[in-house]
Amino acid sequence: MKTHKNHLRLLILLLLVLLACVGYMTVGVHFENQKLFAYAMRIRTPKLIAMLITAFAIGSASIVFQSTINNTIVTPCLLGMDQLYSLIHTAVFFVAGSGSFLAVNANAAFAVDLAIMGAVATMIYSYLFRKTNHNVLYVLLIGTVLTSFFSSIQTTLTRVMDPNEYDTLLTDLVASFSNVNSAILVLSVAVLALVAFAFRKELVLLDVLTLGKDQAINLGVDYDRCIRRLLLGVTLYIATATAMVGPLAFLGLIIANLSRQFLRTYRHSQLITGSVLFGMIVLIGGQLLVERVFVYSVPVSVFITVGGGVYFLYLLLTQRKA
């Protein structure tokens, strides 16, 4: 009975996503003018696809991350990918300037971001995970320390950077769907699909892993290997989304917990689907608000950060009372 209710709830979320997509693609469009209509579709379609891909990457990664860590108020930003992204772009502007190839070529910047973040993720969750005897808390601590380390270096570089370069850099450090490259979208989908295929065996074991280490091992699961590979997959998903549109730190926390509270189930297939759908609603609705109400004066990441901070405090207070 509960499964049927959740299927109905997911269907409602899907309808809301479709409504948000239709609203985003049609609001403010001049249908009577074919040229303006074609121009609007050409501009909005890549943005919409980017929001759908980002919601899929962050939504699915956040649920997997929380289940792996066994904590529902943590977010994948603890892995340090957001700060590493900021450091990479700051270093490029500091060393080569805003007119350099990496600064102006979106495809090259995406490839470099993904390569560096992927290399760091592989080092942490392959080498250091073994060195810490597969201790998840140690790995999270390493991620937190690296986040502070990357942030400190980035702050130091911005303090001695040319003010004009820093002003240009700020547009890169804020998550934006305004200038999305179609080639990047194709590459992002390919990367996400390859990661999902590579870790498909671990994904189907999520329901078992949440029972705890001892129970999972008794059921024949190679627990340490599964956790290591899932954390690597989460990091690659977050790295892909961040390299594509920029850092969205609190989005994962919001949509993952909305999915858990709305569906109230331990089935990860439903939780991940719900998280992805909530992510699409938040991003598309937020971008529609940015474009039509605030006329691009405030980026969507600001609303997500403010809303995520308030929601995080709410989660802390409710869990403390419980």
Pin down the residues of each PLM region:
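Alpha-helical transmembrane segments in inner-membrane proteins
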Residues: 1-322
